[in-house]
A protein has these predicted regions:
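Bacterial N-terminal signal peptides that target proteins for export
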Residues: 1-9
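His/acidic/aromatic-lined binding-pocket segments of jelly-roll/cupin-type domains
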Residues: 134-137, 143-146, 192-193, 200-201
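Bacterial N-terminal signal peptides
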Residues: 8-20
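A short, N-terminal "cap"/entry segment at the start of jelly-roll beta-barrel domains
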Residues: 20-137, 233-241
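Short, conserved beta-strand element in jelly-roll/cupin
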Residues: 138-158, 169-182
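A short hydrophobic beta-strand segment most commonly corresponding to one strand
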Residues: 216-234
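Conserved metal-binding segment of the jelly-roll/cupin
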Residues: 194-214
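Double-stranded beta-helix
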Residues: 163-195
Length: 241
């Protein structure tokens, strides 16, 4: 557990180098316990924000994500990545999305329901071949991942073609990642890398990302600093009981 805490601190420093230099009015620390992470991760769904904190120059969110095995039934009623990623409906839909079916499809899986947003990414009338479906890119939200259990293949890079924006009132936009674009990613700079417990990944805002080839499962913490993209003060309902 000590190593996990140290890695989490390292991610925070890497993602927010300006914290120590900015004129911040934040004067207290926020503690998220191992028990709280487990309590949130035990709830149905895939991607769940734990807390969003005002740290002065920006807001800082921490989430926990569970993805089940690729092409296997998981928690909830699995919708598949293309539907979940490209949509981003309300909280109930997101929490009901299946971890397993969503896992094999990509980063946007489980982050929404069936509502379609506006077009985004590169628009093309030509058929998209050889791309990775179910990818998502966040307009202003950088993410740092710390894999805490399991593993799989993380896909990053490229550009999204014929994507869909997350609707303004969706959970993706308001609670998880801010405005985002989901769809199939293509390009010679797409990277597919197997990641495992203990690995750290930093994904800058605007970089498409998603998952494939998850064996049993992958669980990870997501550290999300941003310039007021998410509303400070949010606390996951599982911690209010």
């Amino acid at each position: 557990m000590r190593n996990t805490v140290l890695k989490a601190v390292a991610i925070a420093v890497a993602l927010s180098p300006a914290i120590g230099l900015a004129q911040s009015k934040a004067t207290s620390a926020t503690y998220i316990t191992d028990e709280e992470v487990k309590a949130v991760n035990a709830t149905p769904g895939v991607d769940r924000t734990i807390r969003v904190v005002d740290i002065g120059p920006e807001n800082y969110a921490v989430g926990v994500i569970h993805r089940g095995a690729s092409n296997a039934a998981g928690r909830g009623a699995g919708t598949g990545a293309g539907a979940g990623a490209g949509a981003g409906a309300g909280a109930g839909a997101a929490r009901g999305a299946g971890g397993g079916a969503a896992a094999g499809a990509g980063g946007g899986a489980g982050r929404g329901g069936a509502q379609q947003g506006e077009p985004c990414g590169e628009q093309s009338t030509a058929p998209t071949t050889g791309g990775t479906p179910g990818m998502i890119a966040h307009d202003q939200q950088t993410e740092g991942y710390l894999i805490i259990s399991g593993g799989g293949t993380l896909v990053t890079g490229g550009k999204i073609v014929n994507g869909r924006k997350s609707p303004p009132e969706s959970e993706v936009t308001k609670v998880l990642n801010g405005p985002s674009c989901s769809g199939t990613a293509v390009g010679g700079d797409v990277v597919k890398k197997v990641v495992k417990t203990g690995d750290i990944i930093i994904i800058p805002a605007g970089v498409p990302h998603g998952w494939t080839d998850i064996g049993d499962h992958v669980d990870y913490l997501s550290f999300r600093p941003s310039a007021r993209v998410l509303e400070a003060g949010y606390v996951n309902p599982a911690l209010k009981k």
